Amino acid sequence: MPHLTSTKTSTSSTELRTGLGVPGYAHPLVAPAEWAELARPGTPLHWAVLDVADGPGARPDPHCLEAAGRLRNAGVRVLGRLDSAHGTRAYGETISEAQRYIDWYRVDGFLLDHCPTDRATLPEVRRTVTTLRAIRDNAHIVLGHGTHPHPGYAENADQLVTFSGSWSDYRWSQVSEWTADYPPDRFCHLVHGVPGPHLEEALRIARWQGAATIWFTDRTDRGGRVDPWETMPGYWDEIVSRIGTGVSE
């Protein structure tokens, strides 16, 4: 089973190779500075998600194509976002969207967002992942559960998002025991509402729980009314410096 592999951009100098996984900025026309920063040399990125219009959109978007190209040229892995709708999405729809991501934006893999977590849906997710790997050689697959799923999912993807939520929940979160059987580069944590003074604590939690790919931001979802991932964290330079130099370790 393939694990997280390095790109041309060095991800980190730490033993755990801690790096950033960007869940998806706003459209490049809305967030041009954010997309430009991701292509800056030396940024410790594991991957960045491209979400054109809740998926690949109905037609190619030249601005998204340009943004994705800049990231690839900088050695950053670009993932297309596919909404699994907690297992209710039709298999054919998912694969059709994936093919459009490949044809239009030459993505390196996929984030299956809102991925189900229970054992009963595991065969269908396995079927989807198998097809994604068939239509895109060496596809990097991230399953966006947002919580700890049935352990069987770990055998069907490169990485699992085992936490996605607020800082108030993250600071008291617990890790499932089965994750100790896998290296940290198999797990991702996405946390919003992390205050700047608590950034070091958040990095420490990720290290203790064994997650090498992270995304921490001080932006909040305002009670579910906004997307906290659409803009850059206020402490962007600090978190890049901490991860890039191994300070978090």
Predicted regions located by residue number:
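Glycan-processing catalytic domains of CAZymes
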Residues: M1-E249
